[in-house]
């Protein structure tokens, strides 16, 4: 994998690749990592905090444009962006937490994304990492992609609460503090309440790259949050950096669902089930998530799977 400094050609190519993929981060001075709700200024412990979120979001979970129990929010300032999903999945908490407490599961999940070219689990001195390559939304050699290494940690895994954190200090073009966090609790109805948070920070180079991206190939791309109506009465959606965060947060959430949905099948057919289900799920939201045709996506992922 090539390293900095980047040529102008690589930077130009990167604008349409990595900015469509950016992962997760939280700088210390801007958007803080989501914390548990508070009562009287006292922080509620994680299980109670997530249960409080579930209660507070009941109306939004029951009535939303997704027509399913799912809430998507995004936040942005001059240095950071974060996307968050709260959702109810039918899987029992025990099944959910056991499946996602394995690092290989996360490589299987992340590999569903268009821009993931490679993911392998690495263990050294007791620490687990996910060694990834990201690149174009079409097939490409690994030597032309970008290497990212994420630490993977099961922070908490009990019968009442699960918290998994993926993080990386730095990425290309001054992107930094990548972070993706998954929290989950069991529900009395038998399902699982899930919170997925995805964030990253960027410096001047990254900011300029994003400005270029959003003025060219990313100009027409939008997220899911409705911000109003245009002069013709059509719905308008958030765009720019928040739209980017919302699209990728949804892609990763749908990848988790696709992974879980294949677990009951024999191992030899799970990969095909995952890639077909993930593509079908993204096509439910073509305005936001359609990028390539199904045959091209499936062919690319099958070929990429051979080199994992």
What are the language-model segments listed below?
Residues 115-179, 201, 259, 282, ...:
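Glycine-rich portal/gate segments that line the openings of hydrophobic small-molecule binding cavities
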Residues 80, 159-161, 175-177, 187-193:
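Coil-to-beta-strand transition motifs
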Residues 33-65, 71, 76, 169-171, ...:
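Terminal "cap-and-tail" regions of soluble proteins that handle hydrophobic small molecules
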Residues 1-10:
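N-terminal secretory signal peptides that target proteins for export/translocation
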Residues 72-99, 120, 240-244:
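Terminal, regulation- and interaction-focused segments at domain boundaries
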Residues 26-32:
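Sec/Tat signal peptide C-region and signal peptidase I cleavage site
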Residues 89-115:
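Amphipathic alpha-helical segments
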Residues 12-26:
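Bacterial N-terminal signal peptides
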